[in-house]
Every structure is written in structure tokens, then in C-alpha cells.
Design a protein with these regions (language model features):
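Alpha-helical transmembrane spans of integral membrane proteins, capturing the lipid-embedded, hydrophobic core
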Residues: 19, 23-27, 31, 61, ...
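Membrane-interfacial interhelical loops
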Residues: 33-64, 100-157
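Feature captures the catalytic ectodomains and active-site-proximal regions of enzymes
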Residues: 51, 76-82
């Protein structure tokens, strides 16, 4: 049986708030990662030399982040719209939405942190060669990652950082 119009409107209002919160947090995660990379891997002389190019650079990065996050939110919106034809599906999507958003946000944060570490080692952002690591001796690669990077601290920091969005989504 299809959900009532009032139920649809009420649930969609709540979902819109969650999507907006996710959008803001995800853009902030990507922007924060870009800030860390920028200040960690450039010096003051370089920033002075290319000062006129910084605003367009930041704008281009922001627009890219907005595009990626908006496409991600669009997938959640599409699922919610398709679920409107069934009361059970609508309720299930409403219950699962925040967990899906939190999982994707955690993935974005983990990829951002991974990209910062990857850049620190290889002096370039993630590229197709990062996937080539699987073709190498995976055990040796994982051993190197485990010994050279603060994996446990990064996971603990990510888990702690996700407490804030989890709390915000729970409100």
C-alpha cells in the first residue's frame, strides 16, 4: 500500500535535512583534506610566488568537491524517490538513510586520509597505480603500510571523528 501524502512529505523533509547535513560535512572533509595537502606540501615561497593562482585553484577544487558530493547525494535521493511507491520501502529507506550517509562519509574521510598519506610517500595523489598494489605482493605491501603508517591511530581518529556526524544525524 502506498504511503500517504502527509507521511511522504514528513519523511522527505527529514531526509532533505540529512542529505544537506551530509553534503556540508562531505564538502568540508574534502576541503579539509585539500587544505592539509596544500599546507603540508608547499612552502611559503611557493605560495607567495603563485599567490594570484590560489583563489582559482581553491575554487576549482571546491567546485569539483561540490560536484562529487552532489552526485553522491543524488543517488540517495533517487533511492528515496523510487521507494515512495511502497509504505514499507519508504519506511526502510528512511531508517537506513542516515546509516548509508554515515558509511559514505566515513569512506570519504578514509579516502581523504589515505590520499594525504599516499601523497606524502609518492608525491602525487591517488592514481591508477594505487590499484596496482594489489597485483604486487599484497602481504608485503600491507606489512609496509602497517609499519610505515599510523594505521591504528588513523582508524581510531576516523572513528572518533565520525562520532560528531553520528551525533548530528541522530538529532
Amino acid at each position: 500500500e502506498p504511503p500517504s501524502e502527509k507521511m511522504k512529505f514528513t519523511l522527505f523533509k527529514k531526509l532533505i535535512a540529512e542529505w544537506l547535513l551530509f553534503w556540508l560535512l562531505a564538502v568540508a572533509v574534502f576541503g579539509g583534506g585539500r587544505l592539509v595537502l596544500f599546507y603540508r606540501h608547499t612552502d611559503e615561497a611557493l605560495r607567495q610566488q603563485f599567490g594570484a593562482d590560489l583563489a582559482p585553484m581553491w575554487l576549482k577544487g571546491l567546485l569539483f568537491d561540490i560536484k562529487m558530493v552532489s552526485l553522491t547525494v543524488a543517488a540517495f535521493v533517487l533511492v528515496a524517490l523510487l521507494a515512495l511507491f511502497s509504505r514499507k520501502l519508504t519506511a526502510a529507506v528512511y531508517r537506513a538513510n542516515r546509516y548509508g550517509l554515515l558509511a559514505v562519509l566515513a569512506l570519504f574521510a578514509a579516502l581523504t586520509v589515505g590520499n594525504v598519506f599516499y601523497y606524502g610517500v609518492y608525491d602525487k595523489p591517488f592514481d591508477v597505480f594505487v590499484f596496482g598494489l594489489v597485483e604486487e605482493d599484497t602481504a608485503a605491501v600491507l606489512k609496509t603500510v602497517w609499519s610505515d603508517f599510523p594505521v591504528l591511530r588513523a582508524v581510531a581518529a576516523l572513528a572518533a571523528a565520525m562520532l560528531v556526524p553520528a551525533w548530528l544525524f541522530g538529532r
